[in-house]
């Protein structure tokens, strides 16, 4: 299976640079995964396609302000007690990728040439000091931090949101890169399908008798890593940490046993429950790391339907949705979305891949 099979032409102006003021006011393309039929709506109309007994699976990870801007410092002979460092002034950017024990983080450091083992970096005039202690897979650096106080509070003060590479400017309100149900800190990128939900919409859905289950997968920057290999089977997926609690696994399994559909909000929720599923198709209470790569030919163990954003050409996320609805249906739907001027990627519009399109009058 070739990477080019998942190419579509996307005009640059359709890449959304800012979120809409109304989260649930984005557009929604509904795709019947069996027939390829497409209808157009406003996202809040998703309720038309949900029913009592369905289970909506959310990823409640929380994006941390993982982008740190600092300066390299060099050891100097102490000139006075307590003054053993001098700033060299070389700007260094750190992206926190994965937390390790003992205040150590796996990071991406720019510029990499300056990031040798032993390098020390000052953030916020010394409020936070990082020392590179090792070089690991893909050239990432392990950095040990020293500080006074609470790390999360310092990070909230000094850090910036690590927006996707196709977003060209900082957000005025960094909370718009969080879902309203974000809870467990650890992601370097948002599970963006969830950005369309408001608390009011979630309550409306729950009041319909739809079960809401929460899982956690901390999204890494690897989610933006392009597929470089021509044969997608040669691609190696990045690793991401996930957790499914027993109470949430029970909600999903009970809904499945009762004949309800399992509807994931986002590809991260999908990858989580598929990673935690046993051979009988039931979700286990489990935590660990997953490198699951879902592409056409994959047989879903748990998932029935998917709410997702529009993804990059030739990306692993586009391959995942093609596994659910077929490459032909997905590419055709994407081409129609381009024609209809949908907004793409993280701050863009949404798609609901379902199996029971009901005839409704198009909103547009």
From Swiss-Prot:
Pathway of action: tRNA modification; tRNA-queuosine biosynthesis
Transferase among keywords: yes
UniProt subunit comment: Monomer.
Keywords, ordered alphabetically: Cytoplasm, Queuosine biosynthesis, S-adenosyl-L-methionine, Transferase
GO molecular function, one term: S-adenosylmethionine:tRNA ribosyltransferase-isomerase activity
GO cellular component: cytoplasm
Family stated for the protein in its record: Belongs to the QueA family.
Top EC category: transferase
EC number(s) recorded for this UniProt protein: 2.4.99.17
GO biological process, one term: tRNA wobble guanine modification
Chief localization: cytoplasm
Subcellular location: Cytoplasm
Catalysed reactions, semicolon-separated: 7-aminomethyl-7-carbaguanosine(34) in tRNA + S-adenosyl-L-methionine = epoxyqueuosine(34) in tRNA + adenine + L-methionine + 2 H(+)
Ranges in a coiled coil: none
Keyword NADP: no
The protein's role, per its UniProt record: Transfers and isomerizes the ribose moiety from AdoMet to the 7-aminomethyl group of 7-deazaguanine (preQ1-tRNA) to give epoxyqueuosine (oQ-tRNA).
InterPro entries (alphabetical): QueA, QueA_dom1, QueA_dom2, QueA_sf
Name of the molecule in the record: S-adenosylmethionine:tRNA ribosyltransferase-isomerase
Entry-linked NCBIfam families: PRK00147.1, queA
Extent of the signal sequence: none
Pfam families: Queuosine_synth (PF02547)
